[in-house]
Curated annotation (Swiss-Prot):
Quaternary data: Part of the 30S ribosomal subunit. Forms a tight heterodimer with protein bS6.
Protein known as: Small ribosomal subunit protein bS18A
Sections of the chain in a coiled coil: none
Classification of source organism: Bacteria, Bacillati, Actinomycetota, Actinomycetes, Kitasatosporales
Cited InterPro entries: Ribosomal_bS18 (IPR001648), Ribosomal_bS18_CS (IPR018275), Ribosomal_bS18_sf (IPR036870)
Main function: Binds as a heterodimer with protein bS6 to the central domain of the 16S rRNA, where it helps stabilize the platform of the 30S subunit.
Length: 82
């Protein structure tokens, strides 16, 4: 016998956080903004998680990499003990 499918939950759209804050230029020196797009392990979060467009994702990734190179952001996350 086939299992009955449960009805799907309605899709809940979340707005683009950069468009909502009216941010047009992503600066590598704005570490507070960039930290929102980096996981606690230091990985750059994906588009599905952050809800930003493909172009914005490329700009954020480039800004994070520049900030890491300039030692404004760490390459890895903070240690678990701190």
């Amino acid at each position: 016998m086939a299992r009955q499918q449960e009805p799907r939950k309605p899709f809940k759209s979340r707005p683009n956080p950069l468009d909502a804050a009216e941010i047009t230029y992503i600066d590598y020196k704005d570490t507070d903004l960039l930290r929102r797009f980096v996981s606690d392990r230091g990985k750059i979060r994906g588009r599905r998680v952050t809800r930003i467009s493909a172009r914005q994702q490329r700009q954020v990734a480039a800004a994070i990499k520049n900030a890491r190179e300039m030692a404004l952001l760490p390459y890895t996350g903070s240690p678990a003990g701190t």
